[in-house]
Amino acid sequence: MAKPNGIIYSSPKSPQHPKIYAKTQVIEHSTQSNGYLSMLRLKLSNKGFWRAYRAPSGYIATRGSSLRCHSAETRHAETEECVREYRDSSDTSSMQGKDKDPASLGKSGTPSPGLAEACKFVYNDAKFVNERAKNDIVLLSRGIMRLDARARQDVAFLGSEFLKLDARAREHTEKIDNDVKRKAERLHHVATILKNKAQSRLKNAADRHWSDGALEADLRRADFAAKQRAMEDALMALEFVKNIHDMMVSKMCNLKRSSLNPNKMTERITLEKNGKMLNFLPGEVSAERISAIQEAYWDIAAALSEADGIDYTDPEELELLVATLIDLDAMDGKSSVSLLAECSSSPDVNTRKALANALSAAPSMWTLGNAGMGALQRLAEDTTLNRCCCIENHQRIEEAVGNRGGGQLEVHGERKITRR
């Protein structure tokens, strides 16, 4: 605000610094001399102070002029504005000043004691306010520095806490990872132990099974089944040979009957050889030739049986083989005779026992043939062989045959021929 013929210093209170209070001092001084009216009003705050306008001759306030200085601030920026207005009513006023005498000029230019004292008081107050403002600024800067240090400490504390949390999270992660690895290793170790125990138990069970003989019996049973299948195949071949033999024997019987009938002398014997039909007269085919053919077939059957890998030293296989030969009525064959001769004179007691048991299982003594009965006689005369029911049965049968006179045994080399 401005008043005519006066100087006004004003500083409004800033809303941004509530702690800083405004101190206002108003000094008014009025004098009435030489038509001058001086009024000084000073308004100061803790932000600063305004010094009065000093002219070379002292503090002067001219009539018709006004000096207005004030400080204005907004919410975001503070500006200081000083407006000085000099108004002259006319150019004559300055001319009047020139027309005055030097005495009056000297008198008017000398400052009054009251104004000097007022200025001194104003200067002291302004100095005091300035010192107070400096102290407030120092305190404010210290507070700001404390706040900055506190903020830095808080930031450092937060950073350290974040680092601690990160380190703790890493420790927890490593601990969980180590626990998982440890559990996996433990499970693997337990699985390995269980596997080793299972393998050891299985091995012990297999060893116990082998020591008990069950595994060996299983292997022998499987081998026996395989050999039995092979012998069944050989049996089929032998049956085929036996059928051929029976047909040839029946053919010879028919030839003998036809030889007695003169009306059938013209009949011929038809044989097939290598796909060709051969016609022979009844007299052209002799019994020796038929016997040779029969022996050839028996040799074929023996070769088939030997090709199957039959072991004559095995008692079980020997019993099976002898039973098969008895069923086929092939005990008098060449291979059968050699087999019975070798087994009856074998140094192995089990082999001789097996042969005796197989011969005793024959349904009739006539099915044994000469080779079978000769082998049975040799086994009966064996002193080292324990007497069994089969040999006793053979002796009873032999006694019964001898008492009736129904049979006589003649030995021609290795072959025995039965005559009725």
Swiss-Prot record:
Transmembrane segments: none annotated. The gene is SPA15. Expressed in leaves. May be involved in the regulation of leaf senescence. InterPro entries: AAF-like. GO terms for cellular component: chloroplast. Its main location: plastid. Keywords: Chloroplast, Plastid, Transit peptide. Residues 85-111 are annotated as: Disordered. PANTHER family: SENESCENCE-ASSOCIATED PROTEIN AAF, CHLOROLPLASTIC (PTHR36725:SF1). This is Senescence-associated protein SPA15, chloroplastic. One of its GO terms (biological process) is leaf senescence.
